[in-house]
């Protein structure tokens, strides 16, 4: 078999045998009609290379997120940006939650990073609490990976706690990678993007996959005020990594 390891994710409807899949939590309403139409309109342009800088898409995201366009880097899905971030930084030490999304650890493993895990407990409803702060003090990581809401527990991290974590990172010269890919599907979730300008050590991950039912398109983006980091990530990624159809879908 070509692939040496088993796929760790759900959503593999192609091998047969899946009746109900609770792991692929995309928008149950499906892909918006306007996105489907934008993809159809883009088909005649397939003979051309896609825009390597995603210019129209970046401007559309900047308007939607109300952040400067210079804060935005697009990628071939959220997972692509996780691996690009790890490749650009090549941290020696990192922390993540347990349980959480497996691709953080996989991306860090590819660059030989030592990962420490902060375990969440059912007795506390799997909530992240202020006990994470002394854990950071003890482990002194170069980067912390958090997911808000956490995947797979679905629990939100309060914004005041995120601010405390960022204060620690700023004081210690560490970074915070914050995955907000599921945030739009929550009722009470508050994005940390208001903290970007004051905290260049913060990078927020977003994707079209969940909110817009676009898992097959592969389109994600990140927000960060550290332009030097975004340039390093762009240099670590492959050219033309966001297809023209994905860009058209994202603009729509």
Segments (PLM) and residue ranges:
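Phosphate-binding glycine-rich loop
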Residues: 54-94
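Short glycine-rich anion-binding loops that position phosphate/pyrophosphate groups of nucleotides
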Residues: 25-28, 78-79, 148-152, 183, ...
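N-terminal "arm"/small-domain region of PLP-dependent enzymes with the aminotransferase-like
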Residues: 1-48, 140, 174
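PLP-dependent aminotransferase-like
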Residues: 1, 87-146
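PLP-dependent aminotransferase class I/II
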Residues: 31-32, 201-252
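Active-site pre-lysine segment of PLP-dependent enzymes
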Residues: 126-140, 152-211
């Amino acid at each position: 078999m070509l692939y040496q390891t088993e796929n760790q994710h759900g959503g593999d409807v192609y091998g047969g045998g899946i009746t109900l899949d609770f792991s692929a939590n995309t928008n149950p309403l499906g892909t918006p009609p306007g996105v489907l139409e934008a993809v159809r309109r883009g088909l005649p342009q397939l003979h051309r290379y896609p825009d390597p800088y995603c210019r129209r898409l970046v401007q559309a995201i900047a308007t939607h997120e109300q952040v400067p366009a210079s804060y935005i880097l697009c990628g071939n899905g959220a997972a692509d940006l996780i691996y690009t971030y790890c490749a650009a930084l090549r941290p020696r030490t990192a922390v993540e939650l347990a349980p959480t999304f497996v691709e953080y650890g996989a991306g860090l493993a590819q660059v030989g990073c030592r990962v420490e895990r902060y375990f969440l407990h059912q007795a506390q409803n799997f909530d992240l609490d202020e006990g994470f702060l002394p854990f950071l003090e003890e482990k002194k990581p170069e980067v912390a990976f958090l997911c808000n809401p956490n995947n797979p527990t679905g629990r939100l991290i309060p914004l005041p706690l995120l601010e405390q974590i960022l204060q620690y990172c700023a004081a210690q010269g560490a970074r915070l990678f914050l995955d907000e890919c599921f945030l739009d599907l929550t009722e009470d979730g508050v994005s940390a993007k208001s903290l970007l300008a004051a905290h260049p050590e913060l990078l927020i991950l977003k994707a079209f996959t969940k909110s817009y039912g676009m898992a097959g398109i592969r389109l994600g983006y990140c927000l960060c005020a550290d332009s030097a980091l975004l340039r390093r990530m762009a240099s670590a990624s492959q050219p033309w990594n966001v297809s023209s159809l994905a860009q058209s879908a994202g603009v729509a």
